[in-house]
A protein has these predicted regions:
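Adenosine-phosphate binding glycine-rich loop
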Residues: 81-82, 322-328, 341-344, 467, ...
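Flexible, glycine/charged-enriched surface loops at secondary-structure junctions
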Residues: 244, 295-301, 347-351, 376-385, ...
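N-terminal ligand-binding/catalytic initiation module
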Residues: 45-321, 585, 611-622
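Glycine-rich phosphate/diphosphate-binding loop of Rossmann-like nucleotide-binding domains
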Residues: 323-441
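Long hydrophobic segments that form regular secondary structure
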Residues: 426-491, 534
Length: 622
């Protein structure tokens, strides 16, 4: 034991000298990476050395010590270290905090009670969002503990649906910068900007250009709250330490005239950059991110349809990256369908699926369904033929000349629609398709409120004993139908999941729980699984594995009337199971170190951070 400890100390010391430069890692233990070596030898080393020697360090039961050079008000301004009134008397003396805080030393429970009391005083969801954002900027540990305690109440505030309103008002409620902003005029400074990030050991990056924010369209720089919110969910749901996350806004302009004419707009006041110039900008960003943060998982978020699929396909083989709008939405929807199959006692290959909306979310859902059907023994051609895609111009079929590649693969042959009775010649509406196809599954991603009309739903229910209906559009006002209507129009036979949160439905004396088809059940676990396994790439099969892991957690499988998706209170357990499935898939594909499931699970558990206060110690910069 003594020899091993001496060897580790020697390794660290030699690493310092070999690197030729020294930096201070001020937050080593609160990142959940504590070890005896880290506490005894202050890690003043560059990231590559840190990664190299940390793997040799023994994991201790107590990860509760953080060392920092910060003191006084500078320490209180650091949200990752600040404990506010919870700093102990000894810490206040050591860290230069005497007199800077009220004399009472509070417990976290007291802080939580006070904070929640103030939160409840807010009279609008936007005020609640601002309150929580301010708490995050002041004390991240308390912020995440509060979210854990009230996840069902607060997750719709920190992310969908309320984050949409926050994005729309971003330049008017802006208080403090978080993450990195890279505007097109700064394209020659991308590497410099990336190296200005507050932390070097970044594990997850979420990046957007703000062009397609939820169902709200082009919100320019205001889209920055999407990466911020997504990364908050990575921490809340999967325990990814906030110091290892980085939100990034790629500001390539905006075509939103309201923003361009707003005197308070904080973004680059210019029409959006397109074509080769845009592609070169993205290429420079990806290259810079890969150099600055070689171990990070890159998540593309809320890019417009024309770019989302193209960028995913362009970079998925080069960097560990995925698009949650495409792959995450597809996986979480597939999980709900798999759970519904258990409820109705059927299989995917027996379904007739109609999907309204043909954007990146819809095609991502179709892609995951096809992959699962192929896994059940269908050919890819037959699987695609079971899906009837309807966009703003009607049914996607061979007779149309306006189809891009992502839609074209789902185009139905003309002979399958010949002879249909349709209301408008040459146009196959959603109602026409439902009447002719007799779908068993109806999915909506078109952000058209009321699109699933009573006529359409009753027609579907007339032909299908247990219609499966997923109105998935966000925010709530964009939902294709209200669950209460769907339950009533089908006499209580519909199996419903929604994209936005809805209350339980009481019909004919029975209570129907409405599960939220929420990506937060998928993407945090995917990121955690990739990080813990060290997978070199993120693949579609990992998302199918994630979907199957999530479907296994469905309450509806064992109890009629229960939701298709687990309660949000169980999301950390779900994320761990999803992560294990993803890590195992990475091993099976030869993309990660060949570890057995128990070893992968141990890595996953070690990676997950819990929001609890560390004991803060002052150290002197060498």
């Amino acid at each position: 034991v003594i020899f091993g400890a001496l060897a580790r100390y020697a390794f660290v010391i030699l690493s310092w000298y070999s690197k030729g430069s020294i930096i201070t890692v001020v937050l080593q233990v609160t990142c959940g990476l504590g070890s005896e070596v880290e506490r005894e030898v202050i890690p003043m080393i560059e990231d590559e050395t840190y990664r190299g020697w940390h793997a040799m360090a023994p994991k201790l039961e107590d990860d509760s010590i953080a060392e920092t050079t910060l003191t006084g008000e500078s320490l209180l301004e650091n949200p990752l270290l600040n404990k506010g009134s919870a700093f102990t008397e000894a810490e206040r003396r050591e860290l230069g905090l005497l007199g800077l805080l009220p004399p009472h030393v509070a417990t976290m429970e007291q802080q939580l009670a006070r904070t929640y009391e103030n939160y409840r005083r807010k009279t609008s969801d936007l005020e609640r969002y601002i309150f929580l954002a301010s708490l995050q900027d002041r004390n991240e540990t308390l912020f995440y503990r509060l979210l854990q305690e009230h996840i069902r109440e607060m997750s719709p505030i920190v992310y969908t649906p309320e984050v949409g309103e926050a994005c729309e008002n971003y330049s008017h409620i802006y208080r403090r910068a978080r993450g990195l902003y890279i505007s097109y005029p700064q394209r020659d400074d991308i590497e410099t900007i990336l190296r200005n990030a507050s932390h070097r050991h970044i594990r997850v990056i979420v990046v957007t250009d703000g062009e397609r924010i939820l169902g709200l369209g082009d919100l320019g720089l205001g889209g920055m709250d999407i990466p911020v919110g997504k990364l908050a969910l990575y921490t809340l749901c999967a325990g990814i330490h906030p110091a290892t996350t980085l939100p990034i806004m790629l500001d390539t302009g905006t075509n939103n005239p309201t923003l361009l004419n707003d005197p308070l707009y904080l973004g680059w006041r210019h029409e959006r950059v397109r074509g080769p110039a845009y592609d070169a900008f993205i290429e420079a960003f990806v290259r810079g991110a890969r150099n600055a943060f070689p171990d990070a998982v890159l998540q593309w978020e809320d890019f417009a349809k024309d770019n989302a699929r193209r960028l995913l396909d362009r970079y998925r083989e080069d960097v560990r990256s995925f698009n949650d709008d495409i792959q995450g939405t597809g996986a979480v929807t597939l999980a709900g369908l798999l759970a519904a199959m258990d409820v109705v006692g059927s299989t995917l290959r027996e379904q007739r699926i109609v999907a309204l909306g043909a954007g990146s979310a819809a095609t991502g859902i179709c892609e995951q369904i096809v992959a699962a059907m192929v896994g059940e023994g269908m050919t890819q051609r037959d699987a695609r033929a079971a899906i009837w895609l309807v966009d703003s111009h009607g049914l996607v079929h061979d007779g149309r000349s306006d189809l891009d590649a992502s839609k074209g693969i789902y185009a139905q042959p003309n002979d399958r629609v010949a002879g249909w009775e349709i209301a408008t010649p040459g146009h196959f509406s959603l109602e026409d398709v439902v009447r002719a196809v007799h779908p068993t599954v109806l999915i909506g991603t078109a952000a058209l409120p009321g699109a699933f009309s009573e006529t359409i739903v009753r027609e579907m229910a007339r032909r299908t004993q247990r219609p499966i209906i997923f109105p998935l559009s966000n925010p709530t006002v964009k939902s294709e139908a209200a669950p209460a209507d769907l339950i009533a129009w089908t006499e209580g036979r519909a199996i419903v999941a929604t994209g936005s949160p809805f209350a339980d439905v009481i019909y004919d004396g029975r209570t129907f729980q409405i599960g939220q088809c929420n990506n937060m059940f998928i993407f945090p676990g995917v990121g955690l699984g990739v990080i813990a396994s060290g997978a070199r790439l993120v693949t579609n099969s990992m998302f199918v594995s994630a979907a199957r892991a999530l479907s296994a957690c469905s309450p509806a499988r064992s109890s009629p009337g229960q939701a298709l998706y687990p309660p949000l209170e169980e999301v950390r357990t779900v994320s761990r199971r999803v992560a294990l499935a993803v890590a195992a898939a990475a091993v099976d594909e030869g993309l990660a170190e060949p570890l057995a499931p128990p070893d992968l699970d141990a890595r996953i558990r070690e990676t997950m951070w819990e929001p609890r206060y560390a004991s803060v110690r002052h150290v002197t910069r060498q």
